[in-house]
Amino acid sequence: PKFKAEGGYSKVAESVFVAALFTYAGPNFVGILNHLGKKNDAAKAQAEIDKMKKVIMESAWDGNWFMRAYDANGQKMGSHECEEGQIFIEPQGFAIMSDIDKDATKKTLAAIDERLNTKHGLVLNNPAFSKYYIQYGEISTYPGGYKENAGIFTHNNAWIICAAAYAGEGNQAFKYYSEIAPAYTEETSDIHKTEPYVYGQISGGKDAGSYICQTGKNFGQGKYSWLTGT
């Protein structure tokens, strides 16, 4: 269905992030059902989890990482085929911790390190959006390097730290932890600027400052201290 700027969205859009959350949380639900003696329900739930894993690999695996979504036009979001926003952080960690595919896990961790990691933490997406996309809405309204447009969200950095540790990549996990943990960022307080003893919601991504034609000027600068689920 054709996307309409007015009159609402179609029901075509699908979130790969939510699909990965389903496969991640599902086994806990299966465990509860088994504990309650509801074996038939547990088997049905497990079948749906296995089905979702297969669908994710068939429809959302981009070759080196997991896509972010299909938009309201049914077009790929978070794919190497996209002009901007080719890779997003959100689905990666939960797809890894869901054991969807071992080979995919290795490739995803490598892509995260190559495409998302910076000395101040993992950016939410890369490349940043440089213009407004009506099908994406709010995320493409922020300047590059801020908030959901390639900012460094400490909250979802934690998901990748957990995923790397889960996959047995302890050194990679600790590297990411060290990039955002207050105990390890004291030396960059002059850049970070927020209280050095607390997490903030975001830090400026590598593109921060592009809105004043000084890309990188505010890279690593903290924002919204205390306000985070990290």
Regions from the PLM with identified roles:
Residues L21-Y136, Y177-F219:
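Catalytic cores of carbohydrate-active enzymes
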Residues F3-A19, G74-S98, I139-N157, C162, ...:
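Solvent-exposed loop and edge beta-strand segments that line ligand/cofactor-binding
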Residues K106, G229-T230:
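A glycine-rich beta-turn/hairpin centered on an aromatic-Pro dipeptide
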Residues C162-T185:
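Catalytic-core region of carbohydrate-active enzymes that cleave or remodel glycosidic bonds
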Residues H155-N156, N171-A173, S189, V198:
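Active-site-proximal binding-pocket segments
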